[in-house]
Amino acid sequence: MSIYLIALLPVLGWGFMPIIANLRKSTPEEQLLGTSISALLFAFILFWILSPEITVLSFIVSFVSGIFWSFGQLLQFKGIAASSVAKAMPISNGTQLVGATLFAVLVFQEWQTVTAVIIGVVAVILILIGVVMTGFQKRGNHITESVSFHVYGIVILSSFFLTLYVVTNQLFDVTGFSIILPQAIGMLTCAIGINLAKKTAISRKNVTFNLMTGLSWSIANLGMFLATAVLGVATSFSISQACVIVATIGGILIFKQKKSPLEWTFILSGILLIMVGVVFLSLLK
């Protein structure tokens, strides 16, 4: 029972992370810097407690994956700033799932059977349909797509980098808690570089506030590590993706976005399709 509660940490942590980041009007760069600082502090504490062995290879690979995360997370924050948490996060989650799936098929040559291909293709289609449905908005007597191509472009590019962040360690077979510290160092190094390149004043209050964003992300990350060790990749992966429910519905309610009954129907149906697609993908892991 307790391990399933731990498995809910990614759901809550990753679900509330973008909501926390947008409770205060910070720039995406400030959000990224605060999140990265908090992630590194959390990583140092875990390293001190667990003392995992870090090799030169695991450090370099994890450091690079942290850089990918920073670019991806910055673009995700930008996508949210250009739309909203409720609109951007289903696109982000859905396209990350599709990206990771394509990488698994093309690079790791998964889906070796016809059945696997059919299940995988159906899963991807369901996820993509679900993503589009969450962005529908009622205008007059018509339902239209409310998310602009500009936002789609930003979030999809974000998902490309976040997919690289996820698969880089897998590609080099770097696993376990040895990932966390060098990855966090890479995250903060890149975040500092991005803020220096911007050459504009940084609000210390905004960065400090976003330490909570980083704490939310770090708790989710730790929960995913612990849940995967006990429940396995398929189960923990499926549970963690419910974060899209928290981010989407939480974003609408907390930021008091008005939705008509028809819009709620499309949003909830879209989320349901995404989660069904996730379950199908978990069958292939």
UniProtKB/Swiss-Prot annotation:
Location of the protein in the cell: Cell membrane
This protein's GO CC annotations: plasma membrane
Keyword hit for Lipid biosynthesis: no
A GO MF term: carbohydrate transmembrane transporter activity
Signal peptide annotation: none
Keyword list, A-Z: Cell membrane, Membrane, Sugar transport, Transmembrane, Transmembrane helix, Transport
Membrane topology: Multi-pass membrane protein
InterPro entries on file: Sugar_transport
Domain of life, per lineage: Bacteria
One Pfam family per UniProt: Sugar_transport
Keyword Transmembrane helix (UniProt): yes
Record field: transmembrane: 2-21, 31-50, 55-77, 111-133, 146-168, 172-194, 207-229, 233-255, 262-284
Protein name: Putative sugar uptake protein lin0444
Annotated source species: Listeria innocua serovar 6a (strain ATCC BAA-680 / CLIP 11262)
Phylogenetic placement of the source organism: Bacteria, Bacillati, Bacillota, Bacilli, Bacillales
